[in-house]
């Protein structure tokens, strides 16, 4: 795909050309994270997930927009620059060259390259870039300059997922991380509003796997362990990419693991029919059940092949991710799912006021029809009423592709504020930040702030309101 190539320019915050009018009340910064480099010294990365991390940002205030773009100077990127050659493998890219025993030993210790390219979390005045295969990478929120990898004071032994979730009532951020080998385990973490972090539990897993996201309510985490088994030895030997070593074993079923916040070492565990999910938008307690708004896939190979095809411009299989509501009944040990949308898409988000609370609204990106799903990423931003299925949507012009839409709230109401999305326009090879009234998506953008360059399609982001 045209967008998925190396970024050509980095810069600090500078004024952006604005079309339309930026609302005077909109004040704060949207930080976006995604891949920025797709090769290392001529060695081409084979997957969207593999690119070295790039943070792009837009800062609104006083009706103006400033933009910045910076690569993350991770340890892996710096090492390859010192070596003047590619050295590490990645999710969809096998390590270059032949078997390398030093590289294998380093991989066994968890010493591999994390591109830090997936998400960002703002916590206690700090800005952390995240990727699930490594520790957080800190950067300066003022100018995006790299600080470096952090284990948060010795809290994180191996990895820290790229999808932390927050409890609005407490302000605590919870997350997970995987360990491979002896033991295969799931670490559970908490980031507290006072700036302290802790490891609260380590839970054994039956096999090495990949867990991309989880759900969080005010009382529990819900971790869905799909039957995706990692072939560990060939991964360590570097014979194939991480993705090529993932095996779909549906006979295992998907394990549902409910981890109480007040007793994290005593999870409730049971199995249901196999399925896969990349992203869970929100979850909440509903009497004796847990409700999760999520994008559900029938299996892992189909969606993994679709994403790989997007990296190479096709050919595409049918995308099958549907947004819906899942209900977990821990007493009956059952999980049910009801689709709310019949079109495919990704990147569900909710208003921060309802994090881990009952929500009615989900924002996500959607394929306008099946032909779009067979040709590339979503082209439509949608606000969905999860109770009724009612929707409000904006379809981008042909050749434009929006990123995950993030709400900059004006109040605690779920649709009161502005949706901001980083949009790539293939007709001009330029990216811009589009601002929408969250309650009136069909009216189109209130403003577009142009970066004057292309930014590769990104994954996730964080809105940080301006200090008052």
Q: What do these predicted ranges mean?
A:
Residues 1-468:
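Beta-propeller domains
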């Amino acid at each position: 795909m045209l967008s998925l190539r190396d970024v050509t320019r980095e810069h600090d915050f500078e004024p952006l050309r604005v079309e339309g009018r930026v609302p005077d009340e909109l004040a704060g910064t949207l930080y976006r994270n995604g891949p920025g480099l797709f090769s290392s010294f001529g060695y081409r990365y084979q997957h969207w997930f593999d690119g070295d991390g790039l943070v792009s940002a837009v800062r609104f205030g006083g009706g103006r927009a400033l933009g910045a773009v910076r690569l993350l100077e991770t340890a892996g990127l710096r090492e390859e620059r010192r070596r003047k050659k590619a050295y590490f493998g990645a999710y969809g890219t096998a390590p270059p060259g032949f078997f390398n025993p030093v590289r294998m030993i380093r991989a066994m210790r968890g010493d591999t390259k994390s591109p830090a390219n997936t998400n960002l979390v703002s916590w206690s005045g700090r800005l952390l870039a995240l990727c699930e295969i490594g520790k957080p990478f800190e950067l300066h929120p003022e100018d995006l300059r790299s600080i470096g990898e952090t284990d948060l004071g010795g809290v994180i032994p191996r990895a820290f997922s790229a999808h932390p979730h927050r409890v609005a009532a407490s302000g605590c951020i919870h997350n997970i991380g995987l360990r491979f080998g002896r033991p295969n385990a799931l670490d559970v973490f908490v980031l507290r509003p006072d700036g302290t972090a802790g490891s609260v539990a380590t839970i054994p897993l039956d096999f090495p796997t990949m867990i991309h996201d989880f759900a969080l309510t005010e009382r529990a985490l819900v971790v869905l362990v799909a039957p995706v088994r990692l072939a560990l030895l060939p991964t360590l030997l570097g014979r194939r990419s991480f993705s090529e070593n993932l095996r779909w074993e549906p006979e295992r079923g998907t394990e549902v693991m409910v981890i109480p916040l007040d007793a994290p070492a005593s999870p409730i565990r049971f199995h249901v029919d196999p399925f896969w999910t990349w992203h869970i938008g929100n979850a909440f307690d509903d009497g004796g059940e847990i409700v999760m708004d999520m994008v559900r896939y029938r299996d892992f190979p189909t969606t993994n092949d679709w994403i790989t095809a997007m990296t190479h411009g096709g050919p595409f299989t049918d995308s099958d991710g549907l947004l819906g509501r899942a209900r977990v009944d821990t007493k009956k040990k059952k999980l049910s799912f009801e689709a709310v949308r019949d079109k495919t898409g990704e990147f569900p988000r909710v208003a921060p006021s309802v994090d881990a609370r009952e929500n009615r609204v989900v924002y996500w990106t959607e394929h306008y029809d099946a032909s779009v799903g067979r040709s590339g990423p979503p082209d439509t931003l949608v606000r969905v009423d999860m109770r009724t299925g009612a929707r409000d949507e904006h379809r981008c012009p042909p050749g434009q592709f929006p990123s995950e839409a993030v709400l900059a709230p004006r109040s605690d109401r779920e649709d009161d504020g502005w949706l901001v999305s980083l949009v790539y326009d293939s007709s001009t090879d330029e990216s811009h930040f589009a601002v929408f009234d969250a309650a009136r998506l069909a009216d189109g953008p209130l403003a577009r702030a142009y970066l004057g360059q292309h930014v590769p399609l990104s994954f996730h982001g964080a809105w940080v309101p301006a200090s008052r």
